[in-house]
Structure formats: structure tokens, C-alpha cells
């Protein structure tokens, strides 16, 4: 997983390398995770469909909608960065 961003509430966002699904299509997983007193709040999306693969914890519907917006708007960039082996910062 490659790091993307860390939000003020402690949510960290990471994304995977490019993988192939059962139909031989290129996919990427984008994972949002926030530490809690009892573990983690987690949501994982699959690109390019932006469908939720996994959800656990106490993220609100508003937070999940925001995360979905992030992955939808960032879709081309996530693929570019995954091909590069992560985000390159000079």
C-alpha cells in the first residue's frame, strides 16, 4: 500500500498497486482508516467502480460520502501514482 494523505481526525488514506480482478481488469484498492479506542474505523473502495468492498467501525454516512467523492475525483491520479510506485514528492 502507498500512502496518500492523513486527515486531521487521524484518518489515513492508502492505495494499492494495480491488481487484476477475475475478469483481468486493472483495479486499485483505496483504504481509509482511523484509529479508535477499540481498534479502527475502516472503509475500502475498489477502483474504477468506486464500490465499497469493506466497511467496519463508526464512520458516518457523510464521511463515507466524502471518501467516495475523493476516490471518484482522484481515480486517474490513483492509477497514475500506482503505476509510478507511489506518489513522488520532490
Language-model regions, residue ranges each:
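Generic detection of intrinsically disordered/low-complexity segments and helix-coil linkers/edges
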Residues: 1, 9, 26, 53, ...
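Alpha-helical interaction segments
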Residues: 5, 49, 68-70
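Negatively charged, low-complexity tracts enriched in Asp/Glu with abundant Ser/Thr
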Residues: 1-18
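Acidic, low-complexity intrinsically disordered segments
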Residues: 55-90
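A short, structured beta-strand/loop element
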Residues: 15-59
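A general, composition-driven signal for non-globular sequence regions
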Residues: 11-14, 38, 62, 77
Amino acid at each position: 500500500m502507498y500512502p496518500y494523505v492523513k486527515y486531521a481526525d487521524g484518518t489515513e488514506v492508502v492505495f494499492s498497486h494495480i491488481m487484476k480482478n477475475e475478469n483481468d481488469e486493472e483495479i486499485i484498492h483505496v483504504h481509509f482508516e482511523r484509529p479508535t479506542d477499540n481498534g479502527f474505523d475502516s472503509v475500502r473502495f475498489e477502483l474504477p467502480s468506486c464500490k465499497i468492498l469493506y466497511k467496519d467501525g463508526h464512520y458516518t454516512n457523510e464521511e463515507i460520502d466524502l471518501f467516495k467523492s475523493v476516490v471518484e475525483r482522484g481515480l486517474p491520479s490513483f492509477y497514475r501514482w500506482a503505476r509510478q510506485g507511489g506518489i513522488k514528492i520532490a
